[in-house]
């Protein structure tokens, strides 16, 4: 079965797309990355940077996660991300999303050895 690091990559990494933020992108990607299986995941962020650059955030500034854990890290530079949010009319199995194309710092949780991203916490 999938590791936490693999799940992070499936749910959040889209390195090679520059994603012009159209809702089609979110609708396709949420489906393709299996976040509409059994329910519609309400919010999800895709990161359009190299995996190497995102993994490097694990050695950048330590911050407290939303849940109070202390293994979150904030990127020193802004990153190109797409926020996908469920629309009001979205209803499983016809999950519908709108896209926001953003340039923000990401906050991710890291764990393990090697110390790698396992959870997307926020963007600021």
UniProtKB/Swiss-Prot annotation:
Instruction: Identify the residues that bind substrate.
Output: 7, 10, 41-45, 66, 85
What GO cellular component entries does it have? extracellular region
SMART domains membership: RNAse_Pc
Tissue-specificity statement:
Pancreas.
Specify where the region named Disordered lies, as residue ranges. 1-23
Q: Taking the first listed entry, what is the main subcellular location of this protein, grouped into a coarse class?
A: secreted
Might you give the EC number(s) for this enzyme? 4.6.1.18
Q: Where in the cell is it found?
A: Secreted
Which principal EC class is assigned to this enzyme?
lyase
Which key words are in the record?
Disulfide bond, Endonuclease, Hydrolase, Lyase, Nuclease, Secreted
The molecular function terms of the Gene Ontology recorded here are: lyase activity; nucleic acid binding; ribonuclease A activity
List where Basic and acidic residues composition bias occurs.
Answer: 1-13
The record's active-site residues are 12, 119
Q: Which family does it belong to?
A: Belongs to the pancreatic ribonuclease family.
Q: What does this protein do?
A: Endonuclease that catalyzes the cleavage of RNA on the 3' side of pyrimidine nucleotides. Acts on single-stranded and double-stranded RNA.
How would you summarize the oligomeric state and partners of this protein?
Monomer. Interacts with and forms tight 1:1 complexes with RNH1. Dimerization of two such complexes may occur. Interaction with RNH1 inhibits this protein.
Designated name of the protein: Ribonuclease pancreatic
For this protein's source organism, the top of the classification is: Eukaryota, Metazoa, Chordata, Craniata, Vertebrata
């Amino acid at each position: 079965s999938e590791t936490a690091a693999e799940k992070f990559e499936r749910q959040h990494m889209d390195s090679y797309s520059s994603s012009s933020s159209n809702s089609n992108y979110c609708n396709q990607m949420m489906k393709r990355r299996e976040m509409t299986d059994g329910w519609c995941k309400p919010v999800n962020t895709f990161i359009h940077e190299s995996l190497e650059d995102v993994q490097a955030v694990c050695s950048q500034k330590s911050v407290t996660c939303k849940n109070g854990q202390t293994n979150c890290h904030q990127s020193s530079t802004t990153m190109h991300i797409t926020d996908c949010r469920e629309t009001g009319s979205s209803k499983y199995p016809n999950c519908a999303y709108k896209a926001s194309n953003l340039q923000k710092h990401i906050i991710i949780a890291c764990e393990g050895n090697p110390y790698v991203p396992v959870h997307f916490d926020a963007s600021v």
